[in-house]
Amino acid sequence: MPAANPVLIQDLPRSRNEPPPLFLIHDASGLLTSYFKLGTLGRRVYGLWDPKFDADGIGGWQSIRDIAEAYIRPIKRVMLRGEIVLGGWSFGGVLSVQIAHMLATSGRGLRVSRIILIDSVYPRCPRPEAQKEPAKLHHAPALPGVNQETRDKLMTALMRATCLSDQWDPPAWSSSRTGVLGTARLHGVPPTPPHAVLIRARDMVPMADPEEKCPLDRTRFLPQLGWEDMQEGFVEQVIETTGNHYSVFDQDHIDTITAHIRKSLDLNLD
């Protein structure tokens, strides 16, 4: 694991008009490997990895709120006040939503102006056709070249993320984007949501049994992967990218996903 958390993934010379830094939150693996493959994003990019990757079982994390609260501290070591962008692949997008809400309600000078969900499935979709079967080992991604010890840790991390996502109590946002995004106007009133962009994979994860569906594709029939059921209008823009959930960061697709993340950062949504 890196010594620092967050890790500086891409640097940018300091300037008066530099764009808000992007903090990418780890996926369900707890690692940042995929984000280091990205091409230049035109701003300072940090990555947060799971400091409890080596822990067994639930690993000390009791909830997504628990993780989000812990991750706010290292973010504030880098950026105490001002505006940031949060994003993440899969589980990292879910964590980004929770972190953004906690920062919005704390009112302590740091706010999230935009969230980028990279094929993040809304885990609490209530629709009957979106209900998933219990996770099975063959639903996990192939891990070629990974030794057994690391493979076991990755599988533990994946199951931990699945368990916590299934128990997540999604935060409440106001229904309109008025005033300063990512802030709460009054104590006890739901905060104004940041801008949110969803990058969704075009393809389904291939399964050996054609009758089976990967759990991460259970909301693929919905334009916003289920986020429309958390709150209508929360996701403002959807961008389709090549590949399936597990392959969007593969070499064949890395230039495309880089371009889509840059577009998500630069879109004028005001």
What role is predicted for each listed range?
Residues 1-270:
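A hydrolase-biased, glycine/serine/histidine/acidic-enriched motif that marks catalytic-domain neighborhoods
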